[in-house]
């Protein structure tokens, strides 16, 4: 697994700036897991499901934390303040994200370019991007004081991810 990850890091060195570190840890690990499982004879679809299940299990503790945070009436305004700052520090090479102006009780972000899609497509696994999109759905779809809305996701065939959080 480590050897595969080292090869992937080398092959995707343009993405390895410090801002992309957290994304690449998840992305390249899942890609390497699929590659290793395939090399051991597991069909790709099963290998991808194995990686997806591991990721979904990993985020389970975050769901409770997110719901607790979103139980506050100020949650959407908090996102408006913190998310643009966070992404300025964590979106590196390969990302194109904008934060359109919106009403007081909404926060929107539009992702035009996503490194998950770019890298998974490069390795012939664009369907893996949808697995990461599902993480957003899992974390944000059932929040107590905010609706998580979108009309499209890059990983599910859209031209962008147009996410909006609207206060309930």
What are these model-derived regions, one by one?
Residues 25-123:
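Amphipathic interaction/junction segments at domain boundaries or subunit interfaces
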Residues 20, 123-125:
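Short, contiguous strand/loop micro-motifs
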Residues 1-37:
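N-terminal, charged low-complexity regulatory/assembly segments
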